[in-house]
C-alpha cells in the first residue's frame, strides 16, 4: 500500500516474455484519511488507495472482481483501453455489462495490446470519486525515448462527504434551476491520493519518465515542476514527438493522461517543489461563484535530491491565463506521424447544453438527455439481427448514433454551456482537428491550421461556448460511450452512445459469468430495452442466440456462484467498523511513521475550510512520507499546416466556402 506516496521501481530494459497477470480483487469499504479527515472510501482487498496495475505489451490481464460493498453495485472500466472485439470487458454498467450486485463476482479478461498511461475506475455512479480508481501502466518494449527510471503521479479532487450525499444535494439544488447548478466543492487536491505528502527520490544527471494521470471528478489540474526542463512525450496512450514545455504549464482535464521526460540537475544542492492546483476557472470564475474564505485549491509534492535538506514551499504562481499559460495539446504530433483521416463518411453533431426537464436541470445532446436502459445496450444490439441493430430507435433514450464498419466518422461537439467539459470516448482514440479557445464560438464548417498529423487522444477538454472537431475510423465493433467525464454531469445525462459496426458486432460473445449477474436484477440479456429475450437470426442463418445458455430465463444455474448474504447492509459509520488498512508502521529506514492519524476521534479544530462540510478536519503534519516498494506507484519497466475548409469532407458532409477560420 502507498498512502499518498510516490513509489519508484526500476525495471530491466529488454525483452520480456508475455505473461498472464491474474488479480483477485474484492471491492470493499475502507476507512481512510487522505487529507487528514477520516471518511469511508471504496478500496480493493480492504486497502485504499487502490493498487497500480503494471503490465507489459503482450500480457494478458485477468481480473476476478468480487463485490464486497454490501450496499452498492459496481463494475470496473479500463479507461483508454480500446477492447478491440472484447467490448464486453469495457466495464460500463448498463452499456457493456449488467452492474455487479453485492455479493457477486465476475471476471475481466483481455489482451494488453496497447502501451502507455491508462487508469481503471468504477463506472457506477459516484464510485470513482469515492475512491475506486487506480493507474494502469503498460510498458513499451521499445520506447521511442531513452530514460533512466519512471514515476507515476495521480491528480484528483477529494471530498469529505460521500458521493451518495453530494449527489442528492446536487440533484436537490437542480430543482427549478434554469441554467444548471453549482457543483459541490472539493475539500482538497491530492497527489498520489495524499495531501502534501508525496516525494520523488531523484538523482543528478538523470532522465525520468513521469506518468501523469488525472483521476479526478470535476476540475482540471495544473501542474508545475519548479525550475526543471520537461518535455511531453505521451498523451492518452499515444507517443508523441518530444515537445519541450519551456515556460508553459501542464494542464490535464479529468480522465486525461500525459507522460513527460524530466531532466534532473547536475547537483544535489537543494530539493524542488511540484505544485498542483485545481482549475479555479472551472470551479469559480466561469460560474460567477465566490471563492470561500480559506479554500485551498493547491497541493505540493517534491523532487528530493537530498533527504537531509529542507523541502521548499511551492513556487509562487499567480493568476493563470487559459489562453496563453498552458501547453496546447493540439500542437503535439504522434510519433507514428499518422496522417489526417480524410474523406469523411459520416458527420455527427453534438449540440450540448443544459435545460429544464420535469422541473429539474439536466444536460442534453441535441435536446435529449441520456437515460440508463433497462438492459445493457450491447446486449440489445447482440440480440437483434444485424439489420435491426442499425436502427437507432431500438436502443431507447441512450442518445444512440449508429456508425458502420470502416467509416471515417467526424464528431463535432458544440458546447453551449458556460463552463468546460472533458469529453471521453470509449473504444477509440480520435484525432483532434480543431478546438476553440474559451468563448470561441460554434462550428460553422470552417477549419483553421489543421495539422496534417493531428494529435490522437481519447479525452478532450471542450471550452465554454466553443467547439471541438474529432475524427476516428469505425474499426472496432461494439457499443461505446462518449460522455463528459465530470461525474456531476454524467448523472444529469451528458452522455451519448456509439453503436459501431452492428453487422460485425455479432462476432462478440458474452461470457457466462457476465450473463449470470444479470438475473440478480431480473434483467434478461437479449431483446429490446423493455422486452424479454427472444431468438434472433444470426449472420450464418442459425436461429437462437449463441451468446446465452438455451434455458428458460430466470432458471437457477447450478454452476453460478452462491450469493454472499453476509455483506453489511450499508456503509459503516465509524472507523472501528471498517477493515483497518494502515496498521502499525513497519520498522524501516525508508518508511518513517505516518505524520497523521487516519481518525476523526480526536477533537477537531473549528472547520473554517468550507461550511458545507462536517467538522472533523484534522490538519496534516508537515513533512513527506517516502517509501521504496515493489508495489504500486512506479516501476521502470510539428509540423502544422492549414488543410483548407473541407479538410477531407465530401461535398455533402460540411458547409461553407473556402479559406480558414480563426478558431484555434
UniProtKB/Swiss-Prot annotation:
Binding of Cu cation 3, residues: 123, 426, 483
Gene Ontology cellular component annotations, sorted alphabetically: cell surface; extracellular region; high-affinity iron permease complex
Gene3D superfamilies given in the database record: Cupredoxins - blue copper proteins
This enzyme's EC code(s): 1.-.-.-
Binding annotation for Cu cation 1: 77, 424
Domain Plastocyanin-like, chain residue ranges per copy: 19-155, 156-339, 340-521
Disulphide bond pairs: none
Broad class of where this protein is predominantly found: secreted
Top-rank lineage group of the source organism: Eukaryota
Pfam families named among the record's database cross-references: Cu-oxidase (PF00394), Cu-oxidase_2 (PF07731), Cu-oxidase_3 (PF07732)
Positions contributing to Cu cation 2 binding: 79, 121, 485
Annotated compartments: Secreted; Cell surface
Inactivation phenotype: Changes the gray-green conidial pigment to a brown color.
PROSITE patterns, per database record: MULTICOPPER_OXIDASE1 (PS00079), MULTICOPPER_OXIDASE2 (PS00080)
InterPro entries associated with the record: Cu-oxidase-like_N, Cu-oxidase_2nd, Cu-oxidase_C, Cu-oxidase_fam, Cu_oxidase_CS, Cu_oxidase_Cu_BS, Cupredoxin, CuRO_2_Fet3-like
One GO-annotated biological process of the protein: pigment biosynthetic process
Induction: Expression is up-regulated upon hyphal competency and drastically increased during conidiation. Expression is controlled by brlA, the master regulator of conidiophore development, and is responsive to the copper level in the medium.
Keywords annotated in UniProt: Copper, Glycoprotein, Metal-binding, Oxidoreductase, Secreted, Signal
Biological role: Multicopper oxidase; part of the gene cluster that mediates the biosynthesis of dihydroxynaphthalene (DHN)-melanin, a bluish-green pigment and a structural component of the conidial wall. The first step of the pathway is the production of the heptaketide naphtopyrone YWA1 by the polyketide synthase alb1 though condensation of acetyl-CoA with malonyl-CoA. The naphtopyrone YWA1 is then converted to the pentaketide 1,3,6,8-tetrahydroxynaphthalene (1,3,6,8-THN) by the heptaketide hydrolyase ayg1 though chain-length shortening.
Protein family according to the UniProt entry: Belongs to the multicopper oxidase family.
UniProt protein name: Multicopper oxidase abr1
